[in-house]
């Protein structure tokens, strides 16, 4: 009897993608006794045909994707299934314990115990976020955390690796300068020089990889971030190609500004009226005084 009812319940749950409540199941199968319905639901839960979630004060039953296998053991209780399902929905960006508590409607003592059990069974894991080092997010054990959580290659134990980034910046610039120097020696004209002095991100990636200065595997996107900092420092330029891609080339550092440009007089709009006397004079000029201070 319960097995037959379980198939009827599964059909009802599948017809409500957002999840069916006990009231929905009672209305769909009014002739089925409550005890039989509970037994049938337990069969579906054990078989992995449905999953149980908690929305507010109510339990919700939702059909599971048949191709999606859960790592949760069949003997897990309903609270563990609810918490596991909430963590699973968080994906590789994870979910804060506060959000788990609000969605599951469990008290903190009970929730901490469930999270501890799931961590012990290596079903979920806690990961510290670079955005909030004192807080942890929970995600499934086999997931690789999103870069927004770990900070990518530039972070180690939630600390920004300033020295590592500086070394990469210097080595990327050195490679661009080597490419430019090599192009200068060939003396094949300005257009050829510009083309030969350009480097792709892939070339820079291979150079850094051959140096062996990084303990982590740096993707092209990581090195493009470093190359952009070289551009922002004024040591290189980013050139767009016809196919939409970008290449990089070293440029000579700009000449330092002259003293006239640095002092207020160099950009003063009323310098023509300035003299040793009168209202416009360097003697009483507040901009000159601030600059000298």
Curated annotation (Swiss-Prot):
The yes or no answer to whether the keyword Chaperone is present is no
Relate the protein's function as given in its record.
DNA-dependent RNA polymerase catalyzes the transcription of DNA into RNA using the four ribonucleoside triphosphates as substrates. Specific peripheric component of RNA polymerase III which synthesizes small RNAs, such as 5S rRNA and tRNAs.
Q: How does it assemble?
A: Component of the RNA polymerase III (Pol III) complex consisting of 17 subunits.
Compartmental location: Nucleus
Which Gene3D superfamilies does the record cross-reference, listed alphabetically?
Winged helix-like DNA-binding domain superfamily/Winged helix DNA-binding domain (1.10.10.10)
Read off the lineage from the record.
Eukaryota, Metazoa, Ecdysozoa, Arthropoda, Hexapoda
Q: Which organism is it from?
A: Drosophila melanogaster
Q: Name one GO biological process term.
A: transcription by RNA polymerase III
Question: GO CC: one term?
Answer: RNA polymerase III complex
List the PANTHER family hit by this protein, alphabetically: RNA POLYMERASE III DNA DIRECTED , 39KD SUBUNIT-RELATED (PTHR12780)
Its family remark reads: Belongs to the eukaryotic RPC34/RPC39 RNA polymerase subunit family.
The identity of this protein, by name, is DNA-directed RNA polymerase III subunit RPC6
